[in-house]
From Swiss-Prot:
Organism for this UniProt entry: Aeropyrum pernix (strain ATCC 700893 / DSM 11879 / JCM 9820 / NBRC 100138 / K1)
Stated family: Belongs to the thiolase-like superfamily. Archaeal HMG-CoA synthase family.
Reported function: Catalyzes the condensation of acetyl-CoA with acetoacetyl-CoA to form 3-hydroxy-3-methylglutaryl-CoA (HMG-CoA). Functions in the mevalonate (MVA) pathway leading to isopentenyl diphosphate (IPP), a key precursor for the biosynthesis of isoprenoid compounds that are building blocks of archaeal membrane lipids.
Coiled-coil stretches noted in the UniProt entry, renumbered to this chain: none
UniProt name for this protein: Hydroxymethylglutaryl-CoA synthase
GO MF assignments: acetyl-CoA C-acetyltransferase activity; hydroxymethylglutaryl-CoA synthase activity
Catalytic reaction list: acetoacetyl-CoA + acetyl-CoA + H2O = (3S)-3-hydroxy-3-methylglutaryl-CoA + CoA + H(+)
Active site location: 92, 124, 247
Example GO biological process: secondary metabolite biosynthetic process
Keywords: Acyltransferase, Isoprene biosynthesis, Transferase
Residues annotated to bind CoA: 252
CDD domains tied to this protein: init_cond_enzymes
InterPro entries reported for this sequence: ACP_syn_III_C (IPR013747), HMG_CoA_Synthase (IPR004656), Thiolase-like (IPR016039)
Amino acid sequence: MPVDSLVGKTPESSAGIHGWGAYVPVYRIPTREIARVWGWPDHQWKALDVYEKAVGGVDEDSTTMGVEAARNAIARARVDPASIGAVFFGSESKPYAVKPSATIIAEALGITPVTMASDLEFACRAASEGMRASIGLVASGVVGYTLVVGSDTAQASPGDVLEFSASSGAAAFVIGPSKGAAAVFESSFTYVTDTPDFWRRGLKPYPSHGEGFTGEPAYFHHIESAVKGLFEKTGLSPGDFDYAIFHQPNGKFPVKVAKKLGFTMEQVKPGLVTPFIGNTYNASALLGLVKVLDVAKPGDRILVAPFGSGAGSDAYSLIVTDAIEEAKPLAQPLEYYLKRRIEIDYGVYAKIRGKLVVRKL
């Protein structure tokens, strides 16, 4: 469908992505190193299809990474930061329990003081909530532009299976009117239930997971339901999309859910990120979207389906416009951050991520 004929046909089509950006820390720890330290057999960690994960430095947290990703998004959007009317920050690993990170990001980028700013919560789907809210704010004319940031320095208990994948990274998007957007939203659909698959209680450093709930009842059920709901709402089918991106808790799940929904590996592979940097939680599916936007061509149709434990999934259909070609070179692509790496061992990883606790005798 030509973009001009799309605009105004759905509520979502009045909004689009003007800028996108990524940030991934330079440090990497191979999953084989984690397995070596804890004695995991090869077949268990290799089954996850995660080769190494990104590790935030001692001076990096979800907010600092969010600022870096947002700078790239704003550079591509070519908008005055002061014109951004709302900032949404989605994270499971905020540096403060009580103090918004969205205001820190807004202040650092010159967006404050005349703006809305909120930290959102819905496990790995929090940033996607911000994207859905942004579509409504922009399409209704309440604000001209919004900034959506998904960023995490994901936690995992030492020796837990989550430690193979829980990683660090950030993605950001400037959402604005469809005119001039690099990609226009065609439609969206959300599906949520109360499912106890993954949680972290207050004052606890590491999350818990109900292993029997993490697969079919949570991840697969919710993503499949959201995507099928989008198909029913729009009349689209897998063959109508050039790219398909799903939340990536590991390298295995997104490929499996894609096949179950009828997508091919050719549609999925360009957006896979987790095998190379691990699961960046709120940035997981969104970094996949960044990776695809870095290479997409005008007229391409993109499906993206983030997921958050607890549990829920959104499904979006976007159509790329001619404006994408001018925006691409204005910031570093995700591939730059994927290739920029310093390998570390478990000792360095444990030290910089605060896993070592020293007690005085």
